[in-house]
Amino acid sequence: MSPARLRITDRTGDLFAAPANTLLIHACNTVGSWGGGIALAFRNLYPAEFRVYRAHCARSTPNQLVGTALLIAPQRASLNGSGGGGHYIGCLFTSRRFGAARDPPDRILRATGPAMRHLMRLVAEEEERTGVRIGEVRMCRINAGLFAVPWESSKRALEAMELGDGEVPGCAQGGVVEVVAWERA
């Protein structure tokens, strides 16, 4: 059987206007800060999920986290009125730090594929464990904002990677995981 791959389609609109059980992916630093750009929008819409992310970062060193991912299931606090819509949050740890201390673009790109493969494995494991199927996969144009990596470079890196056994979520059709990359209108 051929390895599974991601197929990324670009769209313009609201990343967060998604049905329940959608996976929303963004690139993150490893120090527990969602303080600017799209990460700040995630923090404002998903405060309980932000606390899970921050605690995860506090338990590890930046070098341990870079190139990995965190899957955050919908948190009850977000579902009860603070903005969350029953969305899973996928955090790709592609840079150790943020701002002027962010990793250089080549290092961020080297971390992007392994982080996405790890996230797909976490999604497959979550689906197996809970019986809940992720219905849709969305992401922002990862790394292209405050990490200053050209979107086309990240997109190429993601579409070139192969998903192995245990890394293919249930939403894959014919060996392809459809991912919609959203850019704000």
From Swiss-Prot:
Q: Where is the Macro domain?
A: 1-185
Residues given in the record as substrate binding sites = 13-15, 27-29, 34-39, 142-148
Read off the CDD domains from this record.
Macro_Poa1p-like
Q: Which GO terms describe its biological process?
A: peptidyl-glutamate ADP-deribosylation
The GO molecular function terms of this record are:
phosphoprotein phosphatase activity
* SMART domains cross-referenced by the UniProt entry: A1pp
Q: Which domain of life is it from?
A: Eukaryota
InterPro entries with a match to the protein in the record? ADP-ribose_metab_enzymes, Macro_dom, Macro_dom-like
| Family designation | Belongs to the POA1 family.
The protein here is known as ADP-ribose 1''-phosphate phosphatase
> Can you name the source organism?
Chaetomium globosum (strain ATCC 6205 / CBS 148.51 / DSM 1962 / NBRC 6347 / NRRL 1970)
